[in-house]
Regions:
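N-terminal amphipathic/basic-hydrophobic helices that include classical n-h-c signal peptides
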Residues: 1-13
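A conserved beta-strand-loop-helix scaffold within acyl/acetyltransferase catalytic domains
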Residues: 12, 16-99, 142-302
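Short, high-confidence coil segments that cap the C-terminus of an alpha-helix
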Residues: 63-65, 118, 132-135, 266, ...
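Active-site/acyl-donor-binding loops of N-acyltransferases
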Residues: 87, 150-182, 273, 321-383
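Aromatic (often tryptophan-rich) hydrophobic motifs at membrane interfaces
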Residues: 94, 104, 115, 124-128, ...
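The substrate-binding groove and active-site-proximal loops of carbohydrate-active enzymes
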Residues: 109-115
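Histidine-centered acyl-transfer/condensation active-site motif
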Residues: 126-130, 136-141
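Short catalytic-loop micro-motif centered on adjacent basic/acidic residues
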Residues: 138-140, 212, 325-327
């Protein structure tokens, strides 16, 4: 008991929590955020400064997204963690308004940016101080199954007042890059590979077919404009879902892309026919992991599958000295599953922090479980 009390005191004594508006994010905090990333427990593009700040600025009305900030109470008040969060209404799994990690139509992964040496302490401070800031629960969508944060959340004691609830899980295509990337092409079914090669030959009959990869600061503004134009010229432009369809989407994309480009974490792969880009893939690279953010192709050549030809060439040119893994960032059922055999587990869950809300949540879940059991028994009896 004494040891637990001392641990509790240390959490409160050496770290605090605050909730900031976008207007309160200073240049100093931005610099600290950037410096925290190499020290983070988990890091992927969608919790990094280069994505999160443009999203907060461009995709939401003022005040919708807040920044949860952990600081150590040392002489420098060192930054220990940040996560943008937004309010969400009550739902059956959580019978009161709560918060969730910022989610956008362009966020295939969720998480928190926490210092690797202080992550457990940060979660304890969130448990203690979060309710006082109005954060009674925090939903985190699509956590990677191998993330350090998920491991810590799943290991939390299931005590009244605070616990981690897994709401759902899913899988998507993922790729571990082998030492010999040729193995990846050999792993594709003979029938599928034959079909891809036939399309490639037919397309090459129309002119010189070329593939190229451009990374970091070498990515040009012309390439970014080409990608945007390709996406907007297809069905996404017609449906109003392209990045160019609305000014705030375009502003977000341009600000975000330039930030990743300057950091050397942007990568484009392109398929060209007679020198003209007919497929473009916009990717990020962080911690030796690649992420496919968006793909676009010229629908004039749809019968040849230029998008999948672009991805096949990417597989053929993978460099295991540069990248260890690739995340497709797609929904289940994507065509990429035919050429990427591995799957990544993604978990969406809620960290409940308020004792009264926790008790109500547990009661609701027990009731729902009882209803399912009774329904099953009735169906069995009727059958």
């Amino acid at each position: 008991m004494a040891a637990h009390f001392q641990t509790w005191l240390s959490h409160l004594r050496f770290m605090d929590l605050s909730l900031l508006l976008l207007s309160q994010i200073t240049p100093l905090l931005i610099a600290e955020w950037l410096s925290l990333e190499p020290l983070a427990l988990d890091l992927h593009p969608f919790i990094s400064l280069s994505f999160a700040l443009p999203a907060m600025r461009q995709l939401f009305e003022p005040g919708v997204v807040r920044l949860l900030v952990w600081r150590r109470l040392d002489a420098a008040r060192s930054l220990a963690g940040v996560v943008p969060i937004m309010a969400v209404p009550a739902r059956w799994t959580l019978p009161a308004p709560s918060w969730q990690v910022m989610s956008t139509p362009y966020s295939p992964l969720g998480g928190m940016l926490l210092h690797r040496d202080h992550a457990a302490q940060a979660l304890e401070v969130l448990r203690r101080q979060g309710p006082g800031l109005g954060v009674s629960a925090l939903q985190i969508p699509d956590l990677p199954g191998d993330s350090g944060l998920l491991q810590r959340l799943e290991a939390l004691p299931n005590r009244l007042g605070t616990h981690w609830i897994e709401d759902r899980r899913r899988e998507r295509a993922f790729l571990d890059v082998p030492r010999d990337p040729a193995q990846l092409l050999q792993g594709i079914s003979r029938k599928k590979m034959g079909e891809i090669r036939r399309r490639q030959r037919r397309l090459a009959e129309r002119g010189g077919l070329q593939w190229r990869e451009t990374a970091g600061a070498e990515v040009t503004s012309e390439q970014i404009e080409t990608f945007l134009a390709l996406e907007n010229a297809g069905w996404k432009g017609e449906s109003g879902s392209s990045l160019l369809a609305l000014p705030h989407r375009e502003r977000f994309f341009r600000e975000m892309a330039e930030s990743f480009r300057q950091r050397g974490e942007l990568l484009l792969t392109e398929l060209l026919l007679e020198g003209r880009v007919i497929a473009s893939q916009f990717c990020f690279l962080q911690r030796r992991t690649g992420y496919i953010f968006k793909s676009a192709y010229d629908e004039t050549y749809r019968e040849f599958g230029p998008g999948i030809l672009n991805k096949i060439e990417q597989l053929a040119h993978l460099d295991p000295s540069q990248v260890d893994r690739w995340d497709s960032c797609t929904q289940s059922g994507s065509y990429i599953e035919e050429i990427w055999p591995q799957r990544q587990r993604l978990v969406t869950g809620t960290l409940v922090l308020n004792p009264a809300l926790d008790a109500g949540t547990r009661l609701l879940r027990r009731g729902r479980s009882l209803v399912r059991t009774m329904r099953g028994q009735l169906l069995t009896a009727a059958g």
